[in-house]
C-alpha cells in the first residue's frame, strides 16, 4: 500500500485531474489554471513535476504513454491507478470532515503585536483593511461573472468560502483599529509604556506572554 503523505494539496489536485482522464503534467497545470484552482492551491511548474514523480513512486499514478506533438519535447501522459482513486476519496474525505490547525501569518503577527508601537500598528491595520476591501471587491466581481456565465455554485464554492474568511478578517481588523484608537483595548496603556521605556533603554522591549496580565509585568 502507498505510504500516506497528505501535506501538499497540489498532489490532491493532480490526482483529481487524472481522475477525469489521463493527462501529461503541463495539461494538468493548464487545466488547474483555466479553472482558477491556482487561487486555492499553490501551483508552479517546478513543484508540479516533483509532485508527479512522488505520486508515481507511491503507485498512485502510472505512466500510460509518451508522445510528441510537432517540435515539442516528448511528454509523458499519466493515468490514475486504483490505489490513487482510493487515495483521492480518503484524502478528500479527511480534508472535508476534519479541521486542521493552520498557522496563518497574520495570526502570528497578532501574537507579537506589542513589539511595534500602537500608533504604527493602527496605520498598518488601516493599510490591511484597505487591501482587504479591494480583494473583496474583486472577489465579488468574479462571483458576479461566474453567475452571469451560468456556472453552478458548486464550481466556485471555494471562492465563496475565501470571501467569507476575508470579510470576517476585515470585520476583526476594523474592530481592533477602533479599540486601539478609542483607548478601549485592554492593556493599551502598558503597551504604550513599554515603548516609552524602550526609547530610553534599548533592548528592553519584552516579548508578549500569557503568564501575567500587562499591569503585573510592569512591576
Walk through the language-model features, giving the residues of each:
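Basic helix-turn-helix/winged-helix DNA-binding cores
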Residues: 1-101
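Amphipathic alpha-helical coiled-coil segments and their boundaries
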Residues: 118, 125, 152-155, 159, ...
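Non-transmembrane amphipathic alpha-helical segments
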Residues: 125, 132-143, 166, 173
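Acidic interhelical loop/turn segments
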Residues: 140-161
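Long, compositionally biased intrinsically disordered regions
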Residues: 153, 160, 168-172, 178-219
Amino acid at each position: 500500500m502507498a505510504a500516506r503523505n497528505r501535506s501538499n494539496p497540489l498532489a490532491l489536485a493532480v490526482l483529481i485531474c487524472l481522475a477525469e482522464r489521463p493527462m501529461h503534467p503541463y495539461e494538468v497545470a493548464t487545466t488547474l489554471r483555466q479553472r482558477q484552482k491556482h487561487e486555492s492551491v499553490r501551483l508552479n511548474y517546478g513543484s508540479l513535476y516533483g509532485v508527479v514523480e512522488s505520486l508515481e513512486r507511491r503507485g498512485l499514478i502510472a505512466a500510460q504513454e509518451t508522445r510528441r506533438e510537432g517540435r515539442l519535447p516528448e511528454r509523458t501522459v499519466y493515468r490514475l491507478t486504483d490505489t490513487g482513486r482510493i487515495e483521492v476519496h480518503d484524502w478528500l474525505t479527511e480534508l472535508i470532515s476534519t479541521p486542521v490547525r493552520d498557522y496563518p501569518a497574520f495570526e502570528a503577527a497578532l501574537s507579537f503585536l506589542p513589539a511595534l508601537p500602537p500608533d504604527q500598528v493602527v496605520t498598518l491595520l488601516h493599510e490591511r483593511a484597505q487591501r482587504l476591501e479591494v480583494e473583496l471587491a474583486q472577489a465579488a466581481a468574479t462571483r458576479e461573472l461566474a453567475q452571469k456565465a451560468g456556472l453552478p455554485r458548486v464550481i466556485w464554492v471555494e471562492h465563496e468560502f475565501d470571501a467569507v474568511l476575508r470579510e470576517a478578517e476585515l470585520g476583526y481588523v476594523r474592530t481592533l483599529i477602533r479599540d486601539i484608537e478609542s483607548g478601549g483595548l485592554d492593556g493599551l496603556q502598558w503597551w504604550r509604556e513599554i515603548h516609552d521605556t524602550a526609547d530610553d533603554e534599548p533592548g528592553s522591549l519584552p516579548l508578549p506572554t500569557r503568564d501575567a496580565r500587562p499591569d503585573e509585568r510592569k512591576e
